[in-house]
């Protein structure tokens, strides 16, 4: 980023060589995950969010992951959230990713999302016996 503008290379389309059918299939599955799966917490009124959770096993607490993009048919933002020792993907990854997308797309958080953000600012994660 220079002078508040993204490098033009980020606007260039890249082609993977994968048949479009598989892309559409994956997007539909990611949308369903937000509507009725593990990503339900990423639902943002008026925005079609697509996402996928992940959980990485760890000796201690599992790591929480979420990847998503929005809006579905004309993406403006893609996020990847990875919270060490955050538990399942829907524990930290999904809600934090949803807050980031809502703020970016709408330019602000709704009252309920602002309240959720406030809760997350005060949550602590235990790292190997140390709370951070």
What is the meaning of each model-derived region?
Residues 111-132:
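Short, highly charged C-terminal tails/helix-capping segments
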Residues 1-17, 21-111:
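Active-site beta-strand/loop architecture of penicillin-binding DD-peptidases
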């Amino acid at each position: 980023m220079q002078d508040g503008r993204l490098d033009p290379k980020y606007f260039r389309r890249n082609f993977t060589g994968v048949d479009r059918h598989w892309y559409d299939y994956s997007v539909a599955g990611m949308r369903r995950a937000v509507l009725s799966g593990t990503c339900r917490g990423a639902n943002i009124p008026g925005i079609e969010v697509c996402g996928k959770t992940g959980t990485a096993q760890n000796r201690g607490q599992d790591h929480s992951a979420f990847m998503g993009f929005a809006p579905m048919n004309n993406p403006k933002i893609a996020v990847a959230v990875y919270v060490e020792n955050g538990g399942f993907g829907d524990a930290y990854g999904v809600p934090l990713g949803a807050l980031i997308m809502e703020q970016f797309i709408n330019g602000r958080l709704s009252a309920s999302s602002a309240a959720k953000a406030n809760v997350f600012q005060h949550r602590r994660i235990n790292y190997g016996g140390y709370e951070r």
